[in-house]
């Protein structure tokens, strides 16, 4: 992730939900819950995003049992680094905002 690059809110919540392995529907539910309903992912949108995140090496699809139709995904170490940088960036934004508001 290049310095100064911000994740979209959807990508942020998808990555955050994949700290623990989840299948697509679980990702949609967790994302909606964590965002207090602000981020609602349609299946097509989610699977397009998952494909792109796999290509970047930020997440990986886990092996599935032969009879399972559910695909599970999990954050990679690279994805964890991206997520940590984004959390740090968001903290800095909030701290700067609070500082300016306090100073009036």
Question: Where does each model-flagged region fall?
Answer:
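Intrinsically disordered, low-complexity serine/threonine- and proline-rich regulatory segments
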Residues: 1-6, 86, 90
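N-terminal helix-turn-helix DNA-binding core of bacterial DNA-binding proteins
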Residues: 2-45
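A cross-family signal for key residues in well-ordered alpha-helices
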Residues: 16, 29, 51, 84, ...
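Basic amphipathic alpha-helical segments that dock to polyanions
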Residues: 46-47, 53
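Beta-hairpin "wing" of winged helix-turn-helix
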Residues: 54-69, 74
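Amphipathic alpha-helical dimerization/coiled-coil segments
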Residues: 84-104
């Amino acid at each position: 992730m290049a310095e100064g690059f911000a994740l979209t809110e959807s990508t942020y919540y998808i990555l955050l939900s994949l700290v623990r392995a989840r299948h697509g529907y679980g990702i949609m539910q967790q994302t909606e819950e964590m965002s207090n309903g602000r981020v609602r992912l349609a299946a097509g949108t989610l699977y397009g995003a998952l494909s792109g995140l796999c290509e970047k090496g930020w997440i990986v699809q886990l092996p599935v049992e032969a009879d399972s139709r559910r695909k599970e995904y999990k954050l990679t170490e690279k994805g964890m680094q991206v997520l940590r940088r984004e959390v740090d960036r968001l903290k800095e934004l909030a701290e700067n905002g609070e500082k300016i508001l306090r100073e009036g």
